[in-house]
């Protein structure tokens, strides 16, 4: 209690001056240190502000460059996509041309096969493997070959359209990604320190594990463009091939149609000439039959005419057998009567022999008449088949003047096949 009541210590004046001076020096030192820190802080703030502005400006430039680069590739992809869409549309048109062309060959093939079927109904010697049949068979083979080629080309076109659509899908997906990237980078590029909705985000200062390098990005974009270019080139080549196939096959079949038509014309001319010659021979045979029939009638009449003289001679001989006694003489008259009967018998025999020959010849003429009539009917049947059935049916194959590509080349007008 006594200690608590003690008075505080007393200092000397010198101690007071020294203590104050010490406070002055410490305050001066602290102030000086603080001033240096303030100056250093201002310099640091200015430096950091400058660095930040420069860094932000550099980021803005990099974002702008990136936007330009992505926009460049987006334009490349847009161009390729447009070209690919146009090429695919063209291929769809070419596919339609192929389908129409393929369909247009069915009727000519049916006509050709029907002509071959009709010509199997020729009869006799006219059932010949002639030039017409050879050319018809060649025409059928050509049409079958053309249709098989068109089917294969149609399959190639379908596959190319599928590849184009696959490339189109990849381009569209890449374009969507690039559009999203451009939208995002546009937003990032437009941000500034005064923009609303800017804030701190946790765990963003890192490289995403599923991100790709710039080289990989370039390779990916370039690969999509190259794939599109490949399909564009393939599509162009396929269109050229389709044009060539449609044109060449149409020309080949057009020429074969003309060859078949010419073969029909020549074959009909030969058949009609043969029929006309047969008709001429038939007319001559008919004339000869009439002549031979008259000849037979004349021979039969001549034989009949010999009956009177023969009866007279026989009656005379029989009557003279009744002469009495020595009057039954073998006189000259007797011998002449006998000779007359012999002559008559001989002449009748000759007439009958000639009559038999004439009758045989008449039968042969009748057979020849029948054979000629049958052969003419064979020719008429052939002419009917070739001219009425085949050539008339082939008229439904449109004109083959070559002025119109027509359906054989996948044209729009179905009536202009050849």
From Swiss-Prot:
Biological process per Gene Ontology, one example term: flagellated sperm motility
Domain of life (superkingdom): Eukaryota
Main localisation: cytoplasm
PTM annotation: Ubiquitinated, leading to its degradation. Deubiquitinated by USP16, promoting its stability.
Subcellular location: Cytoplasm, Cytoskeleton, Cilium axoneme; Cytoplasm, Cytoskeleton, Flagellum axoneme
Coiled coil: 20-107, 134-177, 266-308, 332-383
Any Pfam family: Tektin
Cleaved signal peptide residues: none
InterPro entries for the chain: Tektin-like, Tektins
Keyword tags: Cell projection, Cilium, Coiled coil, Cytoplasm, Cytoskeleton, Flagellum, Microtubule, Ubl conjugation
GO cellular component, one term: microtubule cytoskeleton
The keyword Flavoprotein is assigned to this record: no
Quaternary state and interactors: Microtubule inner protein component of sperm flagellar doublet microtubules.
Function: Microtubule inner protein (MIP) part of the dynein-decorated doublet microtubules (DMTs) in cilia and flagellar axoneme. Forms filamentous polymers in the walls of ciliary and flagellar microtubules.
PANTHER family according to UniProt: TEKTIN, TEKTIN-1
Family (UniProt): Belongs to the tektin family.
Protein name, entry field: Tektin-1
Protein species of origin: Mus musculus (Mouse)
Top-level taxonomy: Eukaryota, Metazoa, Chordata, Craniata, Vertebrata
């Amino acid at each position: 209690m006594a200690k608590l009541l003690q008075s505080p210590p007393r200092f000397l004046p010198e101690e007071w001056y020294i203590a104050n001076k010490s406070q002055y020096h410490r305050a001066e030192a602290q102030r000086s240190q603080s001033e240096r820190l303030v100056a250093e802080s201002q310099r640091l703030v200015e430096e950091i502000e400058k660095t930040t502005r420069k860094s932000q400006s550099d980021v803005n430039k990099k974002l702008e460059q990136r936007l330009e680069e992505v926009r460049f590739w987006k334009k490349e992809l847009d161009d390729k996509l447009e070209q690919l869409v146009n090429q695919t549309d063209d291929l769809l048109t070419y596919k339609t041309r192929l389908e129409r062309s393929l369909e247009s060959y069915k009727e000519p093939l049916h006509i050709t096969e029907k002509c071959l079927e009709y010509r199997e109904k020729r009869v006799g010697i006219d059932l010949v493997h002639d030039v017409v049949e050879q050319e018809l068979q060649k025409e059928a083979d050509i049409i079958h070959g053309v249709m098989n080629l068109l089917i294969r080309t149609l399959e190639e076109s379908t596959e190319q359209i599928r590849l184009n659509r696959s490339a189109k899908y990849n381009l569209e997906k890449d374009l969507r990604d690039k559009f999203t990237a451009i939208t995002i980078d546009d937003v990032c590029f437009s941000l500034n320190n005064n923009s609303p909705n800017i804030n701190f985000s946790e765990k963003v200062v890192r490289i995403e594990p599923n991100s790709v390098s710039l080289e990989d990005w370039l390779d990916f974009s370039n690969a999509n463009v190259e794939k599109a270019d490949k399909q564009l080139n393939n599509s162009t080549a396929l269109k050229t091939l389709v044009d060539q196939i449609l044109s060449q096959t149409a020309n080949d079949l057009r020429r074969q149609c003309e060859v078949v038509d010419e073969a029909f014309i020549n074959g009909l001319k030969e058949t009609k000439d043969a029929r006309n010659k047969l008709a001429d021979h038939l007319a001559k045979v008919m004339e000869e039959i009439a002549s031979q029939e008259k000849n037979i009638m004349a021979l039969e009449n001549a034989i009949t005419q010999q009956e009177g003289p023969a009866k007279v001679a026989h009656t005379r001989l029989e009557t003279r057998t009744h002469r009495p006694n020595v009057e039954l003489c073998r006189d000259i008259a007797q011998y002449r009567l006998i000779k007359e009967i012999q002559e008559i018998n001989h002449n009748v025999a000759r007439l009958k022999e000639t009559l038999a020959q004439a009758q045989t010849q008449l039968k042969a003429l009748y057979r020849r008449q029948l054979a000629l009539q049958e052969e003419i009917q064979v020719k008429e049947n052939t002419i009917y088949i070739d001219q009425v059935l085949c050539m008339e049916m082939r008229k439904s194959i449109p004109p083959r003047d070559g002025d119109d590509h027509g359906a054989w080349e996948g044209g729009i007008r179905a009536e202009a096949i050849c």
